[in-house]
Amino acid sequence: MARMSGLLAGLPTEVGGATINRLCGSGLEALSQASRAIRLGEAHISIAGGVESMSRAPFVMAKADKAYSRNVSVFDSTIGARFP
């Protein structure tokens, strides 16, 4: 999300981007990391923000075991569940 946003905004390809997935806390974590990088001299300028993308996609599917597999497991991601 961050990398694509930067590229679409016209930032050069040499500028990096990091996507943080902490559900509701993603935007706050992004601001915290940007602030830390500036305070420590790791960056002069940072762009930080957040997007909400979980409301419409609470269920996710794991990668298939093999190509064309029909054995699909669905997991509830609304509470931050990870794949087993």
Question: What kind of region is each of these model predictions?
Answer:
Residues 6-84:
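Acyl-thioester C-C bond-transforming condensing/cleaving domain
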